[in-house]
Curated annotation (Swiss-Prot):
Gene designation per UniProt: CNP
Phosphotyrosine: modified positions: Y110
Family the entry assigns: Belongs to the 2H phosphoesterase superfamily. CNPase family.
Keyword terms, alphabetized: Hydrolase, Leukodystrophy, Lipoprotein, Membrane, Methylation, Neurodegeneration, Phosphoprotein, Prenylation, RNA-binding
EC category name: hydrolase
Name of the protein: 2',3'-cyclic-nucleotide 3'-phosphodiesterase
Length: 421
């Protein structure tokens, strides 16, 4: 008689054997078709990031099963925090303020640990106010956020969920929770968020560029573009000048959504290509670094696949512009005082519009990474001799984009607060 396999009857088999069995079975289940479970390149990339998976859904919809699959997939460096463990009944949070306080304290403690890269929060998360608290915590500890909702066929069917949920909630109880989960929760913006390693590599390249440019004789002749008034200056520290720098990991914005209020945000978020790409790993190509009196950034050359995620209406400074799609793709590396990060993309479009008009500027020499061009009006472009490739996860930024106290795992560091730009 074939008794089949069981962990109990085959104690001599290594754990990896059973992990492969479970992962191969997951590939056949439509409710587990997520890039972070199915795409090994994405799995490897996420292990280089700090990611908070926030599960959302009605009781009985399959959140806990999905949470366990995520933990099983990533294993080491992963922790799950479940509302069930704190005896929190799904519904209004007011009756469980002490329980949520303990949950948040434990979640924050995990965020502070250096050995944890993946955090999984299992709760209904149907209230905007609650989600905003979690997004602020993610900002504080510099975690990227991935919102995950079960794909089970019954996830919004209160009649079926009544039978499946462990809390014995009635169909009416479930219907009260449903409105907050029927609509997608849109971020402040979507984009590609670089891994920690890629962020550090690009940030370092940007800093070397600023140091070399600041010492270049051609730049010294044009200092008046960066120094106010008639203040005499023979040299300037561009690293200090662009002191308003993105904390944590760098990113390349695709669509500014303003939580769904921006024009075209809902339509953008409903695209099939976005839904399939959300939480997926990509490799971005950097072809140039640039400086203007207001910003410094990296130009991103998007592939055909990546261009599918690029909005069709963001590559123009004026209605008559006809720049190629993806022209504005960039990564902000720093801004001058009182300059917002949105200016970086506008500066890049100005440079590319000038190039299209036939003026690439004057080649003034070579730096360690490529040729330096002076474009006039304090604008400089370093065309890389060898393109840089950076790894990134496509997701959303859901926080407020305002300064919050940061508590990274590194000791020291210049940044005392986190401003997402």
């Amino acid at each position: 008689m074939n008794r089949g396999f069981s962990r109990k009857s085959h104690t001599f088999l290594p754990k990896i054997f059973f992990r492969k069995m479970s992962s191969s079975g997951a590939k056949d289940k439509p409710e587990l078709q997520f890039p972070f479970l199915q795409d090994e390149d994405t799995v490897a990339t996420l292990l280089e990031c700090k990611t908070l998976f926030i599960l959302r859904g009605l009781p009985g919809s399959g959140k806990s099963t999905l949470a366990r699959v995520i933990v099983d997939k990533y294993r080491d460096g992963t922790k799950m925090v479940s509302a069930d463990a704190y005896k929190i009944t799904p519904g209004a949070r007011g009756a469980f303020s002490e329980e949520y306080k303990r949950l948040d304290e434990d979640l924050a403690a995990y965020c502070r640990r250096r050995d944890i890269r993946i955090l999984v929060l299992d709760d209904t998360n149907h209230e905007r106010e609650r989600l905003e608290q979690l997004f602020e915590m993610a900002d504080q500890y510099q975690y990227q956020v991935v919102l995950v909702e079960p794909k089970t066929a019954w996830r919004l069917d209160c009649a079926q969920l009544k039978e499946k949920n462990q809390w014995q909630l009635s169909a009416d109880d479930l219907k009260k929770l449903k409105p907050g989960l029927e609509k997608d929760f849109l971020p402040l913006y979507f984009g590609w968020f670089l891994t920690k390693k890629s962020s550090e590599t690009l940030r370092k390249a940007g800093q070397v560029f600023l140091e070399e440019l600041g010492n270049h004789k051609a730049f010294k002749k044009e200092l008046r573009q960066f120094v106010p008034g008639d203040e005499p200056r023979e040299k300037m520290d561009l690293v200090t000048y662009f002191g308003k720098r993105p904390p944590g990991v760098l990113h390349c914005t695709t669509k500014f959504c303003d939580y769904g209020k921006a024009p075209g945000a809902e339509e953008y978020a409903q695209q099939d290509v976005l839904k399939k790409s959300y939480s997926k790993a990509f490799t971005l190509t950097i072809s140039a670094l640039f400086v203007t009196p207001k910003t410094t950034g990296a130009r991103v050359e998007l592939s055909e696949q990546q261009l599918q995620l690029w909005p069709s209406d963001v590559d123009k400074l004026s209605p008559t512009d006809n720049l190629p799609r993806g022209s504005r793709a960039h990564i902000t590396l720093g801004c001058a005082a009182d300059v917002e990060a949105v200016q970086t993309g506008l500066d890049l479009l100005e440079i590319l519009r000038q190039e299209k008009g036939g003026s690439r500027g004057e080649e003034v020499g070579e730096l360690s990474r490529g040729k330096l061009y002076s474009l006039g009006n304090g604008r400089w472009m370093l065309t890389l001799a060898k393109n840089m490739e950076v790894r990134a996860i496509f997701t959303g930024y859901y926080g407020k984009g305002k300064p919050v106290p940061t508590q990274g795992s590194r000791k020291g560091g210049a940044l005392q607060s986190c401003t997402i730009i």
